[in-house]
From Swiss-Prot:
Residues 236-286, 292-342 form the BPTI/Kunitz inhibitor domain. Expressed by the liver and secreted in plasma. InterPro entries: A1-microglobln, AMBP, Calycin, Kunitz_BPTI, Kunitz_BPTI_sf, Lipocln_cytosolic_FA-bd_dom, Prtase_inh_Kunz-CS. Keywords: Chromophore, Cleavage on pair of basic residues, Disulfide bond, Glycoprotein, Protease inhibitor, Repeat, Secreted, Serine protease inhibitor, Signal. Disulfide bonds join C92-C189, C236-C286, C245-C269, C261-C282, C292-C342, C301-C325, C317-C338. Glycans are attached at N145, N231, N255. One of its GO terms (cellular component) is extracellular region. It holds the Pfam family Lipocalin. It is found in: Secreted. It comes from Pleuronectes platessa (European plaice). The precursor is proteolytically processed into two separately functioning proteins. 3-hydroxykynurenine, an oxidized tryptophan metabolite that is common in biological fluids, reacts with Cys-55, Lys-138, and Lys-150 to form heterogeneous polycyclic chromophores including hydroxanthommatin. The reaction by alpha-1-microglobulin is autocatalytic. The chromophore can react with accessible cysteines forming non-reducible thioether cross-links with other molecules of alpha-1-microglobulin or with other proteins. This is Protein AMBP.
Length: 355
């Protein structure tokens, strides 16, 4: 059984000498971490399905890379117990050690003896049950620095849309798509096991293989559009999330308190599902029958399609004139849509104008 150990050293490098309530005191964070990061949901088994790095060594060793397994367990104090299993030169190798938690949720520190390097790692985005993206800033005592991004999955694959968002984040970090290493699914290896390489076959043979069960999505959900997984009961109540990318894209989110679709700035990748291109898409995804009890509140607007609003007093769906919009989510884009949500139209009302 081949086994190596990653040993943490005191935080004497880079001026990281202090502690705060047992946590390492590090420089100001380089990246924002996942909002409301929940460590108890994050621990468990992950697979590194894709990565990129500015480190030349990483790029030189990209051929035929196999997906590895990372198991995280909460240890005593402010530490994470880490067990990593991966294929290395035809042999399954297991490495174990500890990561230091920091005072910033989602930020982790560890030291690599082999490279004499400190690693400052940030969980920039995760939905816990499916994928996680981590950015790592590595600094050696020699002064050499590098940045790596890793895409982890609870299974051996990720949806195409998640991989696309990972690629977008890589570009925002100044690296190109051709630096991304998409790892191969060769199954979970067993420490000490010798792997018989079979280049002519899609996957190598093994004397025995232990495959972990899927923990989250079924196989048919391994790819496809995010809309197929849209959960309005959760998504429409979520706060708007910019995501880890640095773009400035105008989007709309549903404010479940005011029952309005409101503007926010989207970074361009990841974030959550409360993110829509148009007000119409936002309303049609998120509004409920409760909007039928909202008052009619016409207001002037430009460049918007003709809408209908439900008059709760008369029980009618009322058309608005061109150039008039509704100030809340009691707005529909056809009489049929209004009737479907709010009931039978008793009588057509007069065209309304803003007061």
């Amino acid at each position: 059984r081949l086994k190596t150990t990653v040993v943490l050293v005191p935080l004497l490098l880079l001026g990281w000498t202090g502690t705060l309530q047992g946590l390492p005191v590090l420089p100001e964070p380089l990246y924002p971490t996942q909002e409301n990061f929940d460590l108890t949901r994050f621990v468990g088994t992950w697979h590194d399905v894709a990565l990129t790095s500015s480190c030349p060594h990483m790029q030189r060793n990209r051929a035929d890379a196999a997906i590895g397994k990372l198991v995280l367990e909460k240890d005593t104090g402010n530490k994470l117990k880490v067990t990593r299993t991966r294929l290395r030169h035809g042999t399954c190798v297991e490495m174990s050690g500890e990561y230091e938690l920091t005072s910033t949720p989602g930020r982790i520190f560890y030291h690599i003896d082999r490279w004499d390097a400190d690693v400052d790692a940030y969980v920039v985005h995760t939905n816990y049950d499916e994928y996680a993206i981590i950015i790592m800033s590595k600094q050696k005592t020699s002064g050499e620095n590098s940045t790596s991004l890793k895409l982890y999955s609870r299974t051996m694959s990720v949806r195409d849309t998640v991989l696309d968002d990972f690629k977008t984040l890589v570009r925002h970090q100044g690296m190109s798509d051709d630096t991304i290493i998409i790892k191969q699914n060769k199954g979970d290896c067993i420490p000490g096991e010798q792997v018989e390489e079979a280049p002519s076959q899609p996957e190598p043979k093994r004397l025995r293989r232990q495959v972990l069960p899927t923990l989250a999505l079924s196989d048919e959900e391994g790819s496809g559009d995010m809309s197929a997984l849209f959960n309005d009961s959760e998504a429409c109540k979520a706060a708007p999330e910019t995501g880890p990318c640095f773009g400035f894209i105008q989007g709309f989110f549903y404010n479940s308190t005011s029952m309005r679709c409101e503007l926010f700035t989207y970074g361009g990748c990841l974030g959550n599902q409360n993110n829509f291109v148009t007000v119409r898409e936002c309303l049609q995804r998120c509004r409920t029958e409760a909007v039928c009890r909202l008052p009619m509140a016409p207001e002037p607007c430009t460049g918007q399609p003709t809408i209908w609003a439900f008059d709760f007093v008369t029980g009618s769906c009322m058309p608005y004139k061109d150039g008039i919009c509704q100030a809340n989510a009691n707005q529909f884009y056809s009489r049929a849509e209004c009737q479907e949500y709010c009931g039978v139209i008793k009588d057509d009302g007069e065209l309304l104008t803003a007061s």
